[in-house]
Amino acid sequence: MSEREASEPISEQGVSDNGDTFAAEGSQMKRRLSEVDGESRGAVDDALEGSNSDGDEDEDEDEDEDEDEDGEGPHKKQRRERNRFLDIEAEVSDDEEDDEDDEDSELVREGFITHGDEDEEEDDAQGSKDDRLHRQLDQDLQKSSEEDAQKLAKELRERYGRSSSKQYRAAAQDGYVPQRFMLPSVDTATVWGVRCRPGKEKDLVKKLLKKKFNLDKSMGSKKLKILSIFQRDSFSGRIYIEAPKQSVIEKFCNGVPDIYVNQKLLIPVQELPLLLKPSKSDDVRLEPGSYVRIKRGIYKGDLAVVEQLSDNNLECMLKVVPRLDYGKNDEVDPDTQQKKAKKVSFAQRPPPQLFNPTMALRMDQANLYKRDEKHFTYRNEDYIDGYLIKVFKIQYLKTANIHPTVEELARFGSKDGAVDLTTISQTIKKAQASKAMFQPGDRVEILNGEQRGSKGYVTRTSTDIISVSLTGFNAKPLGFPVSSLRKIFEPGDHVSVMSGDHQGDAGLVLIVKNGQVTFVSDQTRENLTISANNLTKSMDSTPTSSDYALHDIVELSAKNVACVIQAGHDIFKVLDDSGKVSTVTKGSILKKINTTRSRIAAVDGNGKEIKIGDTVVEKVGARREGQVLYVQSHQIFIVSKKIVENAGVFVVNPMNVEAVASRENLIASKLDLTKMNPEIAAKMGPPSQTAQPVSVGRDVALNKTVRIRSAGYKGQLGIVKDVNGDMATVELHSKNKHITVDKRKLTYFNHEGGDGITYDELVSRRGRMPHARLGPSYVSAPRTMATGAPGAAPALSGGMTPGWSYFDGGKTPAVGSHGAGAASAWGGASSWGGQGGGATSTWGGQPGNVSTWGGQTGATSTWGGASTWGNKSTWGGASTWASGGENGAASTWGGGDRSAYGGASTWGAAGGASAWGGNKSHHRPDGSNSTWGTAPQGNRSAWGDQPAGSGSSWGGAR
């Protein structure tokens, strides 16, 4: 091969700065290699050895070698020419660019880089430069990744360095790690439980994790020290954050909704294993086609099929049978006359039906949009193939123990309307197996397996496996699936239903055949056939429900009571006081009446008293006999053991029955040993008063005006409209409302007013209210006092002291006497009468002075001619204070001869005659002028009966 041929370029190739060589095309390599002789092959080996030589030689030595190679001539060129076909990867050189340029020039000079056209040389140089840059970039990336890995390893060692302890490694090698080695120390970060809104735990964990990443990016190297965030399904309403300090958590959670940062607690180190311990979740993994039930809204309890799950597994798209009314219940705005959709409540929701576009088009066309033949949008919701397609949150769905009924599965049939019978049978089988509940002691039979037909007793129960001790085997109990067991009952056993429509019903077993048990119900006296696994042995023959039992007396309304004749789980059959049988729900029953505290009694046809518990018999007709359950106003409830219909309960009028035996009479007829023992009788003390007899017939409180004394309506007035036992129905005056109040918490009034009385007082008075107190009405009656003068105000009825009527006598003092001389304080010349017959008026002074109230002369008294306190007065003859003022003759207590208490004044005309005698006067020096004297002057006393004293209040003659 010539030197020229060897120097010609074969293909695009070059040598990079770091020594990497790019190979030529494969076809040219084969052709060139075929021309290489043995001498050239040896040169290739020498070149390989030279390429692997030490790269740390000095530059001077390299230059000397280059000069020697130049002197060798063609031999050197051929050897370097062969290097064109070898891909030699050299180590990365860290020399400066000057050294790299020198090496390039040497390679060109030695023939490693062929000489071609100038364009080719430029292309080779540009390609080498690009390749060098790319390789340098790759090296930088690799270096940075190695640094990141080392940094991450360092962080892990710092955080979990405690796991590298010798004790932990030694324990791990043995296959057992003590729990104390797994507990964090006091130097590690603490876990805080932060309160949050229930149901938002998972959303908040994701939101906080995203916030953590954003803060780390924005803060650079100074990152927020939040180590972990998690939540547990078993601890609702809390999320857990691992951080070294409490302030870090407060800063981190600040501003995040649904988190209550102030309500947090530190989790003790001892409780961390329990907090992080994995537990079996009750949630079922949802897949397209799974059945779920909706927990809330108008579709609460409805079956739905999962169509699609969201990426975050928080929401899913469901296919639901819609409940639409197509705008029938919409409200119309009176202002705009536009329809407004009314929010449908759960109780008023329409029945489930597939979407009907024809009905929607006719009833509510404005809200209907057609997407395609099977896809419609109605009121912003999509309907495909008649089903509602809507997105629901998984937390509002029930995913476990979903057992669809045949009716529900029929709604989700195939496109042609057919129902998958296989799916239905499997669903029913699973539902029956899940409802089968076994208890220790139940006698069971094995249905499948090697022990098929064997019988035994249940010893232990679990969710799916039941431990059974087989009869006749002394071996330990064996475990069997729930589906392979069946309960065993014998005719005569008393059983009760555990679940289903007849839950709570009980009865006596009649027939057992093929796992089905037929028993007679204690409630309806009918035969019922129930699966054996849905029954359990019952010791109580009285069927009960959660709230009400058989033969309970319940209140349906304020005026209607009934007796329970069939008790279900939520539905009850009752017999009301009119004898009508009806079915009611638990919500329609107001309350249960406690018959043990009821004191209502009735009267039978013979006039005897009937109470609860007495035995009665009908006087006419079928002469049914039974025990009194409850006494109503005009009806009584009786239960008989000889009657099957209505659980033995019937209603009759108390007048159509007669008492056979009274429970109280039987108790009273028994011997009282306590009274026979004198020591016990002495300790008991004197006998107490007998209780008030219970009223019979119409209650005394009916139609009485009452005031309520209990809380809620305290102080309000009303009328008693009905009485039922101890409760009274009161119609309030303030508003048209009837309320039920204890009749002993009412105060009873007369309709005319007056003081109120209690119910016990009303019973003792036999319903008669005390009359209102009659007397002067100081509000409406005229204030003018009755007088004896014509035209005076009419007198009111008396009875009081002093009297107000001149027709009533015998008062003290006497009122209303006629006569001139015997004018009473209120009689004779009235206070408002004519001329003054007496002396100077109370208000009048000297003659000529006109009285305050007018008159003919100035001497006219303010209170009339015969002044109130004048000389014809009850108390004396002269004016109250004086006639002329010169002496005491006109004194209040004396002066005139007609004084009520004596002739001379108390203070004496000249000061001589005493009111009680003893002092001398100018008439009787011996002092016989006393009020009680016997002289003619003294006979004019108020107690005398002489003519001079006839004007006295107590005198007899005129």
Swiss-Prot record:
Bias (Gly residues) ranges: 830-839
Bias type Basic and acidic residues, positions: 32-44
Gene3D superfamilies tied to this protein: 2.30.30.30, NusG, N-terminal domain
Segments for region (Disordered): 1-131, 825-891, 911-958
Assigned keywords, A-Z: mRNA processing, Nucleus, Transcription
Annotated GO CC locations: DSIF complex; rDNA heterochromatin
Transmembrane region(s): none
Pfam families per UniProt: CTD, KOW1_SPT5, KOW2_Spt5, KOW4_SPT5, KOW5_SPT5, KOWx_SPT5, Spt5-NGN, Spt5_N
Protein name: Transcription elongation factor SPT5
Organism: Eremothecium gossypii (strain ATCC 10895 / CBS 109.51 / FGSC 9923 / NRRL Y-1056) (Yeast)
Taxonomic classification: Eukaryota, Fungi, Dikarya, Ascomycota, Saccharomycotina
Gene that this sequence comes from: SPT5
